[in-house]
Amino acid sequence: MNSTNMSLKFRSRSAISVALVDQLMFATTIAIARGIRLCAGRSQYLAATCTPSRFVNKFQVRSSSNSKNIDDKLQTIIDSSNLGAVKKQNEANNKSRNASDTVNDTNTAIPSSSETFHQANADEHTISESTKRAILAENPTLPSQRERLRTETSKRIETYLESLQKTIFRATRTLNDATGYSSIEGLKNEVEKLEIELRRAKTTVKECKKAYTDAISVRSQSQQEVNELLTRKHNWSPSDLERFTELYRNDHTNEQLEAEAARKLTDAESKVDSIQLKLTQSILTRYHEEQIWSDKIRSASTWGTWVIMGINVLLFFVATLIVEPWKRKRLVASFEDKVKVAISEVNLSNTDSVVEKNTIPAPEASALNETSFSSQISLEPSLLSLSWSQWTWTKFSNYVKSTTSRVLYGNGEIQAIDARLLLVISTFLGCILGNILSGR
């Protein structure tokens, strides 16, 4: 501990001594600079008073240069000391403060300009809005005006229709994915692409054929000209010799061009053949897949038809055996209740003598109603009451009409045999209809 305290004290004393030495050096440098300046001023004064005028300018220039050099040396000494560093730091702080003040001034000046700009934009916007309103008022049939005059109900209906269209599209796509028609659509698109590619390949073949024909014609013309020159070989001129040499030299080039054109033509034709084969195979595949899909849909529609027919038959049985008897019983019960109420009211309102003379007793009235109802039922036609000789198409159609009206509207009572007969007829007609639909 004592050693550390001693070291700290020594360090602090050394730092204090260094600071004092720096201050003394700075003070001495200042004193030296002042003395040098004073001597320079005195020398200038003596030179100005004692020397001639022609030597004054030279001496002033020399003295000014010497003073500048002295000032520079003094400035370097001051800058190298601690006080010079503190002075530099203070100057840097002052510069940063001045820069921040200028930035703040510019920032305060900018909002005013931005405010004027926004105000000008607002004025221009109001002018444009007023002009736009005037134009819209002059032309009320514009689409924007019609859109503005539309009610919320029409907008909701339009939105609902758009959502319904999207829903139908999604449902259709889902149904196609479920039934496998999406893959058939992919085959259809592939066939269309192959057709376009086949057209392009055929165009390329035509171009290659034209190039091959041109190459053959050029070579044949050169060979014909060579043959003509060879026929008059003994009468060649220097130009004929040069022409023969040129033709003989170009013959090899023409042969290469012809071979290249033939190769390109062969490649183009082979490409057309491959595309044609691929297109034919894609068309056959698409046709086969469409046949399978149509068979699947046809079988599904047949089963759906049979299911619908079964539901109709079930509803017919339910309506005939359950609903109609229940309705009939309820109607009869309500009718009997109304008759009883009416008879009781008549019995209470009239006296015994008036009832005996002018009214019919309740049992007789009910018996009369039952007999009239049974007579109406007995008047209904029935096929069992007819013999084979009495069967005609008119009687059969009348029977069907009356039975159908009784089934649909509840006009009278339907017998069990009539229900069975109608069931057999409807089943027979349903089987015929199902066979016709499935045969398609």
Curated annotation (Swiss-Prot):
Where along the chain is the transit peptide annotated?
Answer: 1-35
Q: Which UniProt keywords apply?
A: Coiled coil, Membrane, Mitochondrion, Mitochondrion inner membrane, Transit peptide, Transmembrane, Transmembrane helix
Q: Which residues lie on this side of the membrane: Mitochondrial intermembrane?
A: 324-416
Q: How does it sit in the membrane?
A: Multi-pass membrane protein
Q: Where is the composition biased (Polar residues)?
A: 91-113
- All ranges on the Mitochondrial matrix side of the membrane: 36-302, 438-440
User: Coiled-coil annotation: which residues?
Assistant: 180-215, 259-283
Q: State whether it acts alone or in a complex, and with which partners, per the record.
A: Homooligomer.
Per the record, the similarity remark reads: Belongs to the SHE9 family.
The protein's name: Sensitive to high expression protein 9 homolog, mitochondrial
Q: Which gene encodes it?
A: SHE9
